[in-house]
Amino acid sequence: LVGSEMCIRDRLGDGRSVLLGDKICQDGVRRDIQLKGSGKTYFSRGGDGRAGIGPVIREYLISESMHHLGVPTTRSLAVLLTGEKVVRAEVSPGAMLARVATSHVRVGTFEFFAIRNQKDHIRKLADFMIERSHPDLSDKKEKYELFFERIVKGQASLVAQWNSVGFIHGVMNTDNTSISCETIDYGPCAFMDSYEANKVFSSIDQYGRYAFSNQSRVAPWNLSRLAETILFLISKNTSDAIKVVEKILFDFDKNFNASLDILSSRKLGFKNYSKKTSSLYSELLNLMEVGKADFTGTFKSLKETLIKEDNTIFLNNFRNLD
């Protein structure tokens, strides 16, 4: 897998994961089963491919939290101790994570073949993903265009859901942008505590590229990289293909804002979205930033305030306001 951030890298994939296969589950959905931390892989880049117990448990807890919050995500089937010692900044017990996903194909998977100009492989990969995730498109004349449009809409919805629960991914490169539009790779991620629009938790993100407020900007950039790999599938005429994908990408912000408007209205207790609820949400976020109020705690206290009819419960979140 490639993993575009500021430059193209040939093999920036998951250096410690092995895809075992897939299985049709009881709900009729086919899911991949992957081991993370099992040892060296083609993408290890000199690493040992092992995982310490800390990062494994973190991914288990956060991915399951995201699932139960209703956010599309890979899931954790099990945590296994390997009996080995893993040496990083400290020595810790070795562990493996059994991870499941509807697909582990990322934008970086398409880039891997594109950088080698392996167009036949790109076509096969696109057809595979259409057949697997969007079988209703298989016989459509414009299936590749529609496939890309669905990914853009899915990613816009996903990032809106991240923002609605205060989730900061931390490493939104193309290798971590899932074609199935699920949250994948829980590395330097975190949930927002005191609200800051530009909050960053990743120690490697010195310039705030993946800051909370930038997530809705990075996602369409990543999707543009996907578009570049499939232009030839959309039209033999490159100029025509560019116009098609530009139009689809232009709608990312509209789709993101529409999703976030609905989610933010619900967080405020309204059944339906209106411009007034959107304005209220924005004003509340501004107050939270000035008052350094806890993101989740503030919204939780809204409910408690109504139940107990005590405004001080809500106002206590803003004790730092002058």
Enumerate the language-model features and the residues they cover.
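Phosphate/ATP-binding catalytic cores across multiple sugar-kinase/actin-like superfamilies
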Residues: 151-162
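Regulatory N- and C-terminal appendages and interdomain linkers associated
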Residues: 4, 8, 206-322
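Catalytic activation segment of kinase domains across protein kinase-like and atypical kinase folds
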Residues: 91, 164-169, 173-232
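Beta-strand segments within the central parallel beta-sheet cores of soluble alpha/beta enzyme folds
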Residues: 77-81, 173-176, 242-246
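Conserved ATP-binding subdomain of kinase catalytic cores across diverse folds
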Residues: 4-139, 157, 179-182, 222-223
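Glycine- and acidic
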Residues: 43-49, 136-145, 204-212, 241-246
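A generic secondary-structure signal for well-formed alpha-helical elements
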Residues: 69-73, 80, 129, 133, ...
